[in-house]
Amino acid sequence: MQQTSDGVNNSRELPKSIIIPPIRGEMAKLRPATCDDLQRMDELCAFDKASVITGKDSQSERAMVHAWVERSVQWSHDGFSDSKLSELCRFAGDVQSRPTIAWAIVPDMLDDVENTFGAIIGMIFLIDIDGWSRSARIQVVLGKDYRGRGYSRDAMPRVMTYGFASEPAGLGLHRIWVGVPATNTRSLSVYQSLGFMKTGTARDVLWDAQNQKYQDFVVMDTLVDEYDAIRSLDAFGLHVIEENPGVVEALSAHEHSVAIPVRRDNLDDAWPYNTSTAEGTSSKRAWWRIIGRGRKRNVNTEGKQ
């Protein structure tokens, strides 16, 4: 692994194989997805109205999810051969061949009943993982009856924390991005609250079969030095779970490790997952408006950025 003096990973290569960590949320836990979970996704009608949510038709969305899970299983079980890994790095522009990590979302409660059988309600992915640019796309696919209940808000910042954490705690990503139809205002609002910034719009690249018209595709992203794991959770009144992968590194990198003990005395005793969490109070400040102000940028001789 090649690193700079400040500890940044300069390697442009992905590992041959990976151990996908479980991740704990407040509403659900995330475990590595398996091919056996795919039938459940059909039962959940997880691909219903896909054109409205992701801009793809249901069959295309289903095929992509199957491919993502299969690639995730391969990377975490058999791994990639030297020749395959070299090909992935050399032809990073081929998004269809890039590695993927897939988690199944397992809620604590299922329809107000304890989920003793571990039934899943959807999946969350890091896809298009590009070792050369240290970039990945995040995607959530939920069952029809479990959308809009807060599962994406609970899972996404925790997966992003793992993605941005330096290796070996995380993937050492530099950029995480999302893509969504311009008409999906609910998702756009969630992504903005997580700190994503709109970086571009591809006009009329998606076909809305339901309304029989073209629609725009909005790209949003956030960078490792912009993303704040603590504030992204606080924006939704969620707790930090320090046992999750990448959290300790995130606290250290963003200088929250000192603030956490100060606030510890005021924690709700009912919170069971760790003893060093931040309070679950909603953020009152639109913090995403100030992200990136402290980033280092090149300055020309006239002092203009």
Where are these regions (language model features)?
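Glycine-/small-residue-rich active-site loops that bind phosphorylated ligands and cofactors
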Residues: G143, R147-G148, T183
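Conserved acetyl-CoA-binding loop-helix of GNAT-fold acetyltransferases
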Residues: G148-A165, S189-S193
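Conserved GNAT acetyl-CoA-binding A-motif
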Residues: A165-G179
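Conserved catalytic-core motifs of GNAT/GCN5-like acyltransferases
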Residues: W177-G179, Q192-K213
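Short glycine/proline-centered loop/turn elements that form peptide/ligand docking sites
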Residues: N184-S187, D204-L206
